[in-house]
Amino acid sequence: TRKMQVPMDADGYIPRIRFTQEPNKLAIITLNRHQNRLDMYFGDPRSTVCKQVLRDESDAYIKEIVFDNIIFYPENFSYLSEKSGYNHLYWYSMGGNLIKQVTAGNYEVKNFLGWSADDDSFYYVSNEESPLRQAVYKIDRKGKKTKLSAQEGINSAQFSTDMKYYMNRYSNLSTPTVITLNDNTGKVLSTLVTNDALKQTLAKYKVPQKEFFTFQTQDG
């Protein structure tokens, strides 16, 4: 048994420990007690020495979505951060150097789906059309963005390891979850789940139609 030399606060947390693609680099993510400062270290399991590669700070707190969207590649890793005011995707070298901010704008990236080495493209889910909707997007090395999901509502996706295909889960206020198999251009190859039986059951109960609305409070 070896104790890793992680330079963290005495009352801090280690919310995640992740394998990278290098056997001598174990990613150790720490939070301070207030959970508004995140540090990531690469620890050598043999020497137990840990090197800091990333620090992120927030005025409020670091959301759990950040930990689960760090994906390690041979030369890079992904990171979601609200340091611009909105949750966006950043691309780092394995040495901890920021290569680029992948997404930007007045919207939130909800989930990073993966990076394709074939064409240096990033796939993600965001709510850039509306806070009430989520769609699947692709953005290439030049910053050209393509919306892959056609349905309006809540979309999520799970990609194959080669990033050529994905399963899309979609639902909205009147549509139970529909699952389709798509290629990485968004083309639907097969419908796997329709939930037609559930639709028919709900129709029998004549459930009132739900709708969203906005209103203004006294303080604006």
Show where each model-derived region lies.
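Short loop/turn segments that connect beta-strands within beta-propeller blades
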Residues: D44-T48, S93-N97, D140-G143, D183-T185
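Short coil/turn segments that connect the beta-strands within blades of beta-propeller domains
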Residues: E22-N24, P74-E75, D118-D120, K164
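Cysteine-rich, disulfide-stabilized extracellular repeat modules
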Residues: V49, G85, L98, D118, ...
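Non-catalytic accessory segments flanking enzyme active sites
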Residues: T1-M8, Y13-F42, C50-K63, F67-D68, ...
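A structural signal for short, hydrophobic beta-strand segments that form beta-sheets
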Residues: L98, V109-G114
